[in-house]
């Protein structure tokens, strides 16, 4: 990690704006998981069909993520972010108008298209502005918005229980449309003289999708990161997709309370974990370039017994302890993924690389979420999938230790490896 360069003037403003964007991004995608009972009462569907609503979103979202990352590498990151936010917010509002299962399924797929562009572009924009020992913390702050959005997703079940499921989609869709207008005024890419990406652009480097994919998969480090991030999706998406239902049935909670317990405790703890992990990695990186890798591995090692506690204890207070510990430590993986990519990838392909990782994670996560619904229809406990998620985290922690800093097969100087 090089000495801290002077940050561009808007560096922390950008983090604040993207914090709100990340909050809306995840709130709009997860509210549907907390209103299962109300939604099924209004639009008849099987458990597998309910699971398919999340799976369809993930398949489209993941499938388009590499292309979405390429757009952020090739064009203005800020414009990609603004367009993505406006379109997915409009689709969130349109979801409230759905009357049939088929219409609901279509809106979820369209949301996958529009939301795919946000996270790769947002995290790459943070990396553009924060090039020294503030990167992990800045990334953690932006992903903190994601955690808050996931936690607020529990409001979907609460609103649906007290009025109608469509009201939540109408409200949050309109909020997102208004905020997109705010970003149009305030969000900007960094000045061209700041950041290695601008330097590479001035040197005439051209980002092409085919060349980017070839460069990524010629790297042993990236292949390891690709497999690691995908396998980690088993645990992450199982908790997001089925924890509210598991708590509702296992502990006999009403829908609204189950949704809040499943989202608030995990995501508030994750918010703290993002900051703790970011600060820890930033400080450690001053003496060890693999700090972001080690911090992530340690976090996964703690998250495994935490999720096992949730799915085995008969006591709700102990389950909440497990959810808090899981949320706190699994967050290390999220806040350090972009810094890890900055250690191992050609700087021109950072957003594309993150998009490719999202593809595999969403394919795995979507299959796992759908499997949860299919297993419920077959009267098999969802807790079995939580156990499989814990096993996947053990594998991920081991794989991380084989990733080493350095960009293979590129002529970019060593000083440019920090994006």
Which role fits each region the language model picked out?
Residues 30, 58-66, 150-151, 267-275, ...:
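Residue-level signature of mid-helix packing/kink "hotspots" within the transmembrane helices
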Residues 63-99:
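Conserved MFS/SLC helix-loop-helix module at the cytosolic interface between two early adjacent transmembrane helices
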Residues 79-93, 291-307:
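Structural signature of the two symmetry-related core transmembrane helices
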Residues 142, 146-189:
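Helix-loop-helix hairpin linking two adjacent transmembrane segments in secondary transporters
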Residues 32-33, 220-275, 330, 334, ...:
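Extracytoplasmic gate region of multi-pass secondary transporters
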Residues 2-7, 191-226, 250:
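Juxtamembrane intracellular "pre-TM" segments in multi-pass secondary transporters
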Residues 107-145:
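Cytoplasmic helix-loop-helix junction between adjacent transmembrane helices
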Residues 44, 76, 97-103, 131, ...:
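Helix-breaking motifs and short loop linkers at transmembrane-helix boundaries and internal kinks
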């Amino acid at each position: 990690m090089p000495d801290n360069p002077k940050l561009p003037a808007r560096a922390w403003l950008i983090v604040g704006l993207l914090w709100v964007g990340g909050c809306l991004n995840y709130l709009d995608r997860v509210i549907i998981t907390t209103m299962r009972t109300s939604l099924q009462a209004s639009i008849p569907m099987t458990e597998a069909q309910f699971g398919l609503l999340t799976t369809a979103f993930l398949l489209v979202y993941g499938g388009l993520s590499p292309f979405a990352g390429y757009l952020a590498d090739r064009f203005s990151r800020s414009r990609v972010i603004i367009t993505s936010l406006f379109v997915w917010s409009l689709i969130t509002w349109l979801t409230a108008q759905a009357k049939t299962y088929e219409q609901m399924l279509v809106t979820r797929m369209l949301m996958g298209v529009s939301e795919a562009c946000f996270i790769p572009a947002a995290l790459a924009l943070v990396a553009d502005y924060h090039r020294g020992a503030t990167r992990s913390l800045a990334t953690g702050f932006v992903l903190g918005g994601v955690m808050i959005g996931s936690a607020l997703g529990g409001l979907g079940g609460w609103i649906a229980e007290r009025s109608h499921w469509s009201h939540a989609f109408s409200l949050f869709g309109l909020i997102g449309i208004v905020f997109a207008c705010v970003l149009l005024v305030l969000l900007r890419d960094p000045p061209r003289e700041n950041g290695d990406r601008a330097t590479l652009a001035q040197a005439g480097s051209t980002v092409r999708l085919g060349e980017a994919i070839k460069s990524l998969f010629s790297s042993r480090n990236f292949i390891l990161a690709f497999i690691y991030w995908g396998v980690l999706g088993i645990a992450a998406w199982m908790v997001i997709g089925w924890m509210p239902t598991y708590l509702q049935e296992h502990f006999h909670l009403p829908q609204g309370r189950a949704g809040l317990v499943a989202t608030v405790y995990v995501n508030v703890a994750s918010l703290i974990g993002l900051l703790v992990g970011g600060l820890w990695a930033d400080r450690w990186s001053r003496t060890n370039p693999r700090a972001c890798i080690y911090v992530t591995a340690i976090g996964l090692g703690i998250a495994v017994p935490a999720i096992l506690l949730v799915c085995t204890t008969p006591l709700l207070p102990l389950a909440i302890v497990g959810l808090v510990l899981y949320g706190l430590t699994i967050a290390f993986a999220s806040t350090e993924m972009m810094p890890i990519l900055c250690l191992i990838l050609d700087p021109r392909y950072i957003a594309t690389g993150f998009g490719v990782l999202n593809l595999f994670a969403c394919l795995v996560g979507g299959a796992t979420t759908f499997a949860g619904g299919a297993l419920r229809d077959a009267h098999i406990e969802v807790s079995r999938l939580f156990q499989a998620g814990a096993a996947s985290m053990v594998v991920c922690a081991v794989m991380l230790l084989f990733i080493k800093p350095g960009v293979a097969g590129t002529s970019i100087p060593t000083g440019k490896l920090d994006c």
